[in-house]
UniProtKB/Swiss-Prot annotation:
The active site is at D23, N71 (proton acceptor). Mg(2+) binds at D23, E204. Its cofactor is Mg(2+). Its EC number is 2.5.1.-. Binds 2 magnesium ions per subunit. SUPFAM superfamilies: Undecaprenyl diphosphate synthase. It comes from Neisseria gonorrhoeae (strain ATCC 700825 / FA 1090). GO terms for molecular function: ditrans,polycis-undecaprenyl-diphosphate synthase [(2E,6E)-farnesyl-diphosphate specific] activity; magnesium ion binding. One of its GO terms (cellular component) is cytosol. InterPro entries: UPP_synth-like, UPP_synth-like_CS, UPP_synth-like_sf. It is an enzyme of class 2 (transferase). GO terms for biological process: polyprenol biosynthetic process. This is Isoprenyl transferase. Substrate binds at residues 24-28, 36, 40, 68-70, 72, 74, 185, 191-193.
Amino acid sequence: MKSSTQTILEHTAIPRHIAVIMDGNGRWAKKRFLPRIMGHKRGLDALENMVKHCAKLGVQYLTVFAFSTENWRRPEDEVSFLMGLFLQALQKQVRRLHENNMRLKILGSRERFNRQILQGIEEAEALTANNTGLTLSIAADYGGRWDILQAANKLIAEGVSEITEDTLAKHLMLGDAPEPDLFIRTGGETRISNFLLWQMAYAELYFTDILWPDFDETALDAAVASFQKRERRFGRTSEQLPIGQQRN
């Protein structure tokens, strides 16, 4: 059986694909006696800085968890603000991405988004579709279980007689991208919260107490430095790895 793990980069100075849960916006605001929405605003600034630094480092794919299927349970005013911030980012930031030859993709179900947001998504993806630089994928109304289920349902609808790792992987939201090499979660929590459950099977996990609005270039460099020290064996022994990939 052909395994999807062949898309993972086994050893490199810089991870080809970084996935991030941007956690801690609300706590960042609370510590400063500010409304939670101010934390989300600063979180957007942190994302802009991370995109720039990832491109500078040579990262090819950056996938961030912006809004999960479970986040609809948050207070109505916060959800409304997040949707407005999402639309604002689509309208204002996509031009900057396009000017820097970056591609934008939105992952997740779009059934609950209003017409204005749907139009913003379509226009942003179309504008940047042919760019060849860093690909920024934003997971919004996304869940890892939902992703696997929708991929399986697509295959059933196509009448596929046998589902393999390879065929399923190609129907996932990140089906055209290599699997993440490095997963970062800020804010002190040590779980993956239903994010990219299939795709992160072999990702290196990095957890930090830094709240997302404070996650800067230095913090990203520290995460990458940790990644560079890892020995990625994928079931093999250390002795089976090429000399340059063995950990001292």
